[in-house]
């Protein structure tokens, strides 16, 4: 049952306690991706705010004021603490209240930006209208130039989606679950179509705006990606992806995003608005701000452990989202059982934090290391070995490619060695132009030798005489990572996400 109370029953401090606590399950641990610096006569700086220097013990970023506009919700998603059928305290901020909180907290150096989300108040369009009012007040009346990440509401009108894109640095639509079946099971008020449609509109508008100012239609990626010809952002992979979409066009309707991207869906393409259309949709008092459209791109979030989807399904969905919608980030949130329901894990079940960690590592391999999802997992092996990081797991299944000689290997080959990252691989490639290397110099370059020495040679020699045998190396690597894995799996014991009360507020 809903506990409905009007705003006069709560003070600002009480609302803050309720709505900041209700927002903690939204993931926002990322740099802003925006390079807009402070300007004379305006408040805030989008450059410094997104550095993510403050994290809670569970990895969530606390540099943003992460808050809900309201936790009233007409939807009844089974996994959500704010679902309509739950008996919880309900509160709603007015636009002015959120603006005042944001500005005052920024002046006191508590926060460096705003992460704004909301439950569904009345209907999606009404809710999104109120959220856009908040953003417009911050940018115009309060001259707030800091970083803003807004969660858009699926089902809201195109005009409001365009307004949010102009006013915020990053916009996102939570996918929540990777399959239509999962959504039908746990979120009966949502459909894959209503989620992917605004995602496609935002992507097309970002691309159109970037081309209008002389940039590539695709978001900027790590500079190292230009050397990864097999990576998911390479021209070859993009062409292969488009061919797959074309071949599946006839079977598109009614399929899951994990099988194909909605970008090839004619319904989505027809409803996507162009840059000029978005500009015309923007209110006149907003369009004169001459802002970029979502300069930090868009992101999404998927819940881990609420349903039975495998890591393979999640990772395939992730790759399709990156390639089909040019997302800047995909976030994963280990499900914390909060509601009693026969289709959900029992209350008290530990959240799969280590699994979440492995998915983030795999996501990193897709974005920076040139891996494809089907290289890391297959239908026959659909889940990661939680005792090993995904890169080590892949290397152990492909020992025929090792050892790699560091003095002759390409940048792409070095990146596939456990313990070698983009920075250390780049340093190796640059250093070997000036002389020979040894394992001491590799360590100084940042190579993690406790993992890498099993898979590399330097000058034709191994660091130690170790057998290139899967069982032996697996046992050694599991022993090395055991302490880290235990800490990750038990990260929620004795710790919790920092709240405003930790700063003496609320």
Predicted regions, residues:
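Conserved AdoMet/S-adenosylmethionine-binding subsite of the radical SAM
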Residues: 99, 122-369, 375
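Flexible, acidic/Gly-rich N-terminal and inter-domain linker regions that tether
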Residues: 1-72, 448, 456, 464-493, ...
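Canonical Radical SAM [4Fe-4S] cluster-binding loop centered on the CxxxCxxC motif
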Residues: 67-96
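Short, charged beta->alpha transition segments
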Residues: 66-68, 96-107, 285-286
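Short Fe-S-cluster ligation motifs
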Residues: 103-117, 362
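Conserved, mostly hydrophobic/aromatic
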Residues: 64, 77, 116, 173, ...
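Long, highly charged, low-complexity intrinsically disordered interaction regions
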Residues: 343-415, 451-506
């Amino acid at each position: 049952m809903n506990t409905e109370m009007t705003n006069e029953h709560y003070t600002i401090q009480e609302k803050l306690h309720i709505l900041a606590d209700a927002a903690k399950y939204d993931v926002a641990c990322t740099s802003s991706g925006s390079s807009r610096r402070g300007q004379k006569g305006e408040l805030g700086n989008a450059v410094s705010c997104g550095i993510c220097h403050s994290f809670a013990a569970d990895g969530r970023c606390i540099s943003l004021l992460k808050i809900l506009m309201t936790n009233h919700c007409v939807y009844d998603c089974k996994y959500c603490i704010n679902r309509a059928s739950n008996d919880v305290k309900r509160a709603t901020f007015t636009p002015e209240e959120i603006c005042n909180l944001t500005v005052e907290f920024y002046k006191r150096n508590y926060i460096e930006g705003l992460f704004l989300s909301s439950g569904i108040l009345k209907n999606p369009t009404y809710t999104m209208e109120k959220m856009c009012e908040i953003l417009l007040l911050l940018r115009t009346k309060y001259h707030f130039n800091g970083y803003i990440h807004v969660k858009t509401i699926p089902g809201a009108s195109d005009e409001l989606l365009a307004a949010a894109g102009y006013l915020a640095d990053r916009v996102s639509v939570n996918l929540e679950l990777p399959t239509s079946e999962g959504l039908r099971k746990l979120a009966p008020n949502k459909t894959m179509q209503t989620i992917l449609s605004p995602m496609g509109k935002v992507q097309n508008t970002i691309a159109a705006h970037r081309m209008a100012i002389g940039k590539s239609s695709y978001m900027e990626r790590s500079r190292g990606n230009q050397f990864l010809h097999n990576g998911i952002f390479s021209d070859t992979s993009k062409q292969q992806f488009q061919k797959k979409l074309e071949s599946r066009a006839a079977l598109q309707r009614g399929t899951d995003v994990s099988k194909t991207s909605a970008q090839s869906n004619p319904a989505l393409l027809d409803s996507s608005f162009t840059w000029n259309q978005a500009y015309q949709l923007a209110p006149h008092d907003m369009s004169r701000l001459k802002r970029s459209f979502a300069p930090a791109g868009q992101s999404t979030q998927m819940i881990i452990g609420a349903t039975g989807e495998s890591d393979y399904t999640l990772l395939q969905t992730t790759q399709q989202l990156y390639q089909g919608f040019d997302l800047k980030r995909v976030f994963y949130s280990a499900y914390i059982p909060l509601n009693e329901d026969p289709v959900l894990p029992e209350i008290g079940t530990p959240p799969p934090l280590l699994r979440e960690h492995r998915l983030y590592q795999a996501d990193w391999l897709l974005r920076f290391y040139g891996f494809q999802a089907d290289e890391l997992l297959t239908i026959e092996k659909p889940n990661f070995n939680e005792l090993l990081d995904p890169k080590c797991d892949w290397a152990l299944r492909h020992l025929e490619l090792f050892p790699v000689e560091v003095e002759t290997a390409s940048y792409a080959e070095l990146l596939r060695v456990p313990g070698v990252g983009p920075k250390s691989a780049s340093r190796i490639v640059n250093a070997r132009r000036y002389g020979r290397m040894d394992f001491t110099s590799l360590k100084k370059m940042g190579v993690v030798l406790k993992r890498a020495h099993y898979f590399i040679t330097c000058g034709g020699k191994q660091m130690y005489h170790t057998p290139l045998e899967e069982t032996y190396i697996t046992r050694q690597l599991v022993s090395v990572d055991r302490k880290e894995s235990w800490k990750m799996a038990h990260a929620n014991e004795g710790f919790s996400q920092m709240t405003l009360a930790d700063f003496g507020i609320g």
